[in-house]
Design a protein with these regions (language model features):
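Acidic, glycine-rich flexible loop segments
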Residues: 130-133
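Key DNA-contact positions within bacterial/archaeal DNA-binding proteins
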Residues: 202
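Aromatic/histidine-rich interaction motifs
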Residues: 102-127
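A short, N-terminal "cap"/entry segment at the start of jelly-roll beta-barrel domains
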Residues: 1-10
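N-terminal regulatory/effector-sensing and dimerization cores
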Residues: 9-108
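Non-catalytic effector/regulatory segments
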Residues: 12-16, 37-39, 63, 90-93, ...
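Short, Lys/Arg-enriched, Trp-marked, Pro/Gly-tolerant hinge/linker segments that flank
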Residues: 113-118, 135-145, 152-192, 196-197, ...
Length: 217
C-alpha cells in the first residue's frame, strides 16, 4: 500500500484491548507530508528503500521527511493506543523551517546520504506537548512553536534542519494534486493535466516516475 494513510489507518487495527507482542507490518508507505509520530506502547522498526534499518523504541518521538518511502514493522508492547501520528502541512512546515534555519551552521557538511528519519526519547513534557498539537483548532503559532520544540530535541539538529528545508520545496506530484483538488467534481485524466500544464503526457509520466509515483486514468 503506497500511502501515508496506511500508517494512519493502522491505528484502527490496534484500537481497544490489544495484548502485548502483537505485530503489524506495512510495505511501501509514502509520506506525502512530513509527520511526527509518538510511540507510546510500541516499538517501530523502519526499513528504508536504500536498505537502511532504524529501530525506534517505545516512549519516543519520530520525525519522518516528506516523500519518504518505508516499510514498517510495529511491535505492540501493551494495551491501548500504541502510537499517535501528526502530519505537518506545508504552510506550518515553512514557518518551522524559518524558525530553525539559524541552527544550520554548516550546510555544506550535509552530504547526499543525509538522514530523512529522526527520533529522540520523549519525557513527560514532550508527551504533553505532542498531545497539544494533536488537539482540534490549535492556533497556528502554537503549532509552530510546539512542533519546533519537539524537533529541537533531536541530536543531529543540522541534518534535521536540512531535511525540513528540502521538504518545503513543492514536488511535481504536489502540483498535480493542487490542480486536481481545484475541481474535485471533475474526473481528471492525464490529457486534462497535460492541457493545464502545457506538457505532453509522456513528460508528465516521466516526472512522476522520478518521484516514484504514477497516474492512473
Amino acid at each position: 500500500m503506497n500511502s501515508q494513510n496506511a500508517l494512519s489507518n493502522m491505528r484502527l487495527a490496534v484500537r481497544g484491548d490489544i495484548s502485548g507482542n502483537s505485530t503489524l507490518v506495512l510495505k511501501k508507505i509514502r509520506f506525502y507530508n512530513c509527520a511526527i509520530i509518538y510511540l507510546r506502547n510500541a516499538q517501530l522498526l523502519v526499513k528504508t528503500i536504500d536498505g537502511g534499518v532504524i529501530n525506534i523504541p517505545a516512549e519516543s518521538i519520530c520525525y519522518i521527511e516528506k516523500n519518504t518511502v518505508i516499510d514498517v514493522t510495529l511491535n505492540v508492547l501493551g494495551k491501548g493506543m500504541p502510537y499517535d501520528i501528526f502530519h505537518i502541512d506545508n504552510n506550518i512546515l515553512s514557518c518551522i523551517c524559518k524558525v530553525m534555519e539559524p541552527l544550520l551552521l554548516n550546510p555544506h557538511k550535509i552530504g547526499p546520504m543525509r538522514s530523512r528519519i529522526f527520533n529522540c526519547m520523549a519525557d513527560k513534557t514532550d508527551t504533553e506537548i505532542f498531545k497539544m498539537i494533536t488537539e482540534a483548532n490549535v492556533p497556528n503559532h502554537r503549532l509552530i512553536y510546539n512542533i519546533t520544540y519537539l524537533l529541537s530535541k533531536v541530536d543531529d539538529i543540522e541534518s534535521l534542519v536540512c531535511s525540513l528545508s528540502v521538504s518545503t520545496d513543492s514536488t511535481f506530484t504536489e502540483k498535480l494534486k493542487l490542480i486536481i483538488e481545484s475541481d474535485l467534481s471533475k474526473s481528471w485524466r492525464l490529457v486534462d493535466l497535460a492541457n493545464v500544464l502545457h506538457m505532453s503526457e509522456v513528460s508528465i509520466r516521466k516526472k512522476l516516475e522520478k518521484e516514484n509515483n504514477n497516474f492512473n486514468n
